[in-house]
Amino acid sequence: MATGRNTTGVLADSLDTIVASARARREYEAVVPQLVDRVDLSPHSGLSWKEIMFAKLSAQAITEQTVLDNPQLFDDTAITITPQMVQIQTFITDKTGRNLSTKSLAQMGKLAGNAMMRKRDEDGLTALDGSTTQLGTIGTPIVTGDIAAARYRITSNATEPGNLPISGVFHGYVIKDMYDELAAGIGSYPVPEGATAQVFKGGFNLPIAQVSIHEDGNITIDSNADAKGFVFAKEAWVLVNGMTLKTETRREPHIGGGGE
């Protein structure tokens, strides 16, 4: 008969491995869908959302002697947006569902929703990447003047001005450049309470020329260590919701002993 002290190493076969906790990998919140106009495509109204935009009319000066015979034509243009469908599929065998930790199963349940929200944000960023005007240069840190310039290009645009609110969406690394610009004097001269002190203590969350700044880590950093940022009026972009989010379960008894 063996003798000695009983330790966990001696009784390793009797120890169970228990999942104490589980968590999903953290993701960035969907930023862009929250900052644009959102409309719903009504049921039984076709595949596309359609809006009619009318061009400006011209008025003219007259006198008391004027016999006005210059009718203006209305010029209409159709803006058509067709929503794209997004879907995700998972399959869990009955054996997996029976034997997996309930803590793990609870986390797995929300991953599909996270993926859908991330896809919406990435699609929004792709659309914004088609913006017509580019400010700044490759390899050069952004300055707050670029954001102010973009803001006034929007609100004073000669073709059609954009109205407030105006948002700026940037990668956090780019927002750090804004922080550096505003906090550059710290250590060189006294910093009284104000914008600089506020940013130094709480991070860069100030508006710039009425542009609200938002961090979105889903923005891609390219091979030059650059990340694009976007400044836009809310009404410039329309997110059309077609089918509402839904979940469905289909039994597959012939796969792996059954699953869904």
Question: Which functions belong to the PLM regions below?
Answer:
Residues 93-164:
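Alpha-helical scaffold segments that mediate packing/assembly in large oligomeric complexes
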